Swiss-Prot record:
Its job: FAD-dependent monooxygenase; part of the gene cluster that mediates the biosynthesis of the mycotoxin cyclochlorotine, a hepatotoxic and carcinogenic cyclic chlorinated pentapeptide. The function of cctM within the pathway, if any, remains undetermined. The NRPS cctN initially catalyzes the condensation of L-serine (Ser), Pro, L-2-aminobutyrate (2Abu), Ser, and beta-Phe in this order to produce isocyclotine. After the dichlorination of Pro2 catalyzed by cctP2 to produce isocyclochlorotine, the cctO-mediated transacylation of isocyclochlorotine can furnish cyclochlorotine.
UniProt signal peptide: 1-23
Gene: cctM
Pathway: Mycotoxin biosynthesis
Name listed for the protein in its UniProt record: FAD-dependent monooxygenase cctM
Binding site for FAD: E37, G52, R112, D306
InterPro entries to which the protein is assigned, alphabetical: FAD-bd (IPR002938), FAD/NAD-bd_sf (IPR036188)
Pfam families: FAD_binding_3 (PF01494)
Organism annotation: Talaromyces islandicus (Penicillium islandicum)
């Protein structure tokens, strides 16, 4: 390709929040882009969850057109209008007594599926495209998919999550592998009896955290608000440190959670033990990958979102950093005089310089926080207690 040739196409692998927001940024700046998603359709996954935007609200507004920004509240778990007095209350899981109220001004709590549907508006997405290979000649890059189809562009951005194939291509399997955490978690989205809904929402209408001196962390929050309490669904997560494999799967996950809840204070014990027996649970060991520099093959391949900085969830930093990735990529694009392949390479270089440092700090701090909130002696010095939900630097 001759110097100064116009950018033909950017390939984005993964239609999660990071991928779709980067696609919106590229569209905003007139750069052709296609998103390739391994799922066969937008709602193919049976599991949904929710997440918070705590400090990246202005970055998000940089990524989206005004007509989508104005619809963000419609993607929330409830009808709450963000305000400066928003908090996330934290309780003692053994006694039910309040611990602290974490400030969360103007925060959004978004249903993942609703949010992705909103930010996919106007984006070219190809579904059923599971990546099998990446090949760059330092000028163009080709993605090969499981269905034998291929796509070629001037830049490929891997945004396909913690177990990124693109990250493996850039760093090799060993260096790209996530690091298993000492922490395991059981999670569900479930309806609850009306009495338990009322008890929970008296603590806070939207959500709360409860932490046990014996090393448990419990998240309880609205996932889908309904007019009738009996129709509301809640996302519930219980995590703890386990050095060995728990062996939990199927119905054993719920039974184990309810057994552990025997030592919890009210209303948490009754809430957890009232989860209907037919409810589906998930159980997994957490993992992370402290961001490290990679060879972007002359700016033709890079990473963003969980592919660049997969982290533990206990301080809600993952989505905020994914949004920041997209916003910073957009800022670098906005500074260009042209959209040539050479200038796009310069965008990638500047983008990665900021991302590598911020991503490593975010992952490291999230790991520290996750271990601290499972250790009663260290809880008060945890990033959650000392910095709340806002962005924190390790320096």
């Amino acid at each position: 390709m001759e110097p100064g040739t116009d950018v033909r196409r950017v390939l984005v692998i993964g239609a999660g929040a990071a991928g779709l927001l980067i696609a919106q940024v590229l569209k905003k700046h007139g750069v052709p882009c296609t998103v390739f998603e391994q799922d066969t359709k937008a709602d193919a996954r049976p599991r949904d969850w929710n997440y918070g935007i705590y400090w990246a609200q202005s970055y998000l507004a940089e990524c989206l057109p005004p007509e989508l920004v104005s619809q963000l509240e419609s993607a929330q778990v409830d009808s709450h209008t963000p305000s400066g007095s928003d908090i996330l209350p934290t309780f003692n899981l053994a006694t039910g007594e309040p611990l602290i109220s974490v400030s969360a001004p103007y925060s959004y709590r978004l249903q993942r599926r609703k949010f992705l549907n909103l930010i996919s508006t106007g984006i070219d997405i190809q579904y059923g495209k599971r990546l099998t290979m990446v090949d760059s000649d330092n000028k163009t890059v080709t993605a090969v998919f499981e269905d034998s189809s291929q796509a070629t562009g001037n830049l490929l951005i891997g945004t396909e999550g913690a177990h990124s194939r693109v990250r493996e291509y850039l760093l090799g399997k060993e260096r790209a592998a996530v690091i298993p955490s000492r922490i395991v978690a059981s999670a569900t989205v479930s309806r609850l009896p009306e009495r338990e809904v009322s008890a929970l929402r008296k603590l806070h209408p939207r959500y709360c955290i409860a932490i046990h001196p014996d090393g448990y962390f419990n998240w309880l929050g609205i996932h889908d608000e309904a007019a009738q309490s009996k129709d509301c669904t809640f996302m519930i997560i219980l995590s703890w440190i386990s050095e060995s494999d728990t062996g939990l799967s199927g119905t054993a996950i719920a039974a184990d959670l309810k057994e552990r809840a025997n030592t919890f204070g009210e209303p948490f014990r009754t809430v957890l033990q009232s989860i209907p027996s037919e409810t589906t649970f998930w159980h997994n060991r957490l993992s992370s990958w402290p961001t490290q520099p990679w060879n972007s093959h002359n700016g033709t391949v890079t990473l963003a979102g969980d592919a660049a900085h997969p982290m533990t969830f206990h301080r809600g930093q993952g989505l905020n950093n994914a949004i920041t990735d997209a916003a910073y990529f957009g800022r670098q694009l906005a500074a260009l005089d042209t959209k040539s392949t050479e200038s796009l390479s310069a965008v990638v270089t500047a983008f990665e310089e900021e991302l590598w440092k911020r991503g490593n700090e975010a992952v490291t701090q999230s790991d520290i926080n996750s271990l601290s909130v499972h250790n009663w002696e260290e809880l008060k010095s945890s990033p959650l207690f000392t910095s709340g939900l806002k962005q924190r630097s390790s320096t």
